């Protein structure tokens, strides 16, 4: 096992140079360096994720508003909502976050591009949290799932004009007039497709279309689409 001194300061610099040049590097040292490097990167990602999370809980209007709305719904509950319900961790899948009604919110520290990506992701998952408290969502019910995904993508800010344009641009079918709705629908279909009760992407699209009008129009707890 490595001492902490091996992974810091001059000794880490020496090991890095040795790894890059290969001079005097044994196979065991190479493997150990790669393992230590990965551990250092995971720790760095985790600390940055929690730093961004705490900043958003303090300063983001959307996040603060959603936390207040959740706290109001949660009055009288034995399970108080606080920052312990929002954790950062490594995710093997290509997703930026997740929500579980019993465990809370997961932020995928290795998938978040920057502070603002975390804000969109956290806002998205907080809307799921709100929906679950307000309507006791059955997450295996495809219509329930689709409705919350539509609301989360629409209200979180992840489908605002500039974010969607950065992802797609004009050459990938982006349309200014309906860009927001197209983005919401696309992302909802992707999420519902991952539900174990969903048969196919076409099945997910059908479910999303069935609940679209009422769910897209429902902006609670906001008065309108804020971001």
UniProtKB/Swiss-Prot annotation:
User: Its membrane topology, per UniProt?
Assistant: Peripheral membrane protein
Residues of the active site are 125
- Family statement drawn from the similarity comment of this UniProt entry: Belongs to the peptidase M76 family.
Listed GO MF terms? metal ion binding; metalloendopeptidase activity
- What EC number(s) would the UniProt record show? 3.4.24.-
Question: Which positions does UniProt annotate for a divalent metal cation binding?
Answer: 124, 128
User: Does this entry carry the keyword Hydrolase?
Assistant: yes
The SS bond pairs are: none
Annotated gene: ATP23
The record ties this protein, via Pfam families, to: Peptidase_M76 (PF09768)
Keywords of the record: Hydrolase, Membrane, Metal-binding, Metalloprotease, Mitochondrion, Mitochondrion inner membrane, Protease
What organism does the record attribute this protein to? Saccharomyces cerevisiae (strain Lalvin EC1118 / Prise de mousse) (Baker's yeast)
* InterPro entries from the UniProt entry: Peptidase_M76_ATP23
Q: What is this protein called?
A: Mitochondrial inner membrane protease ATP23
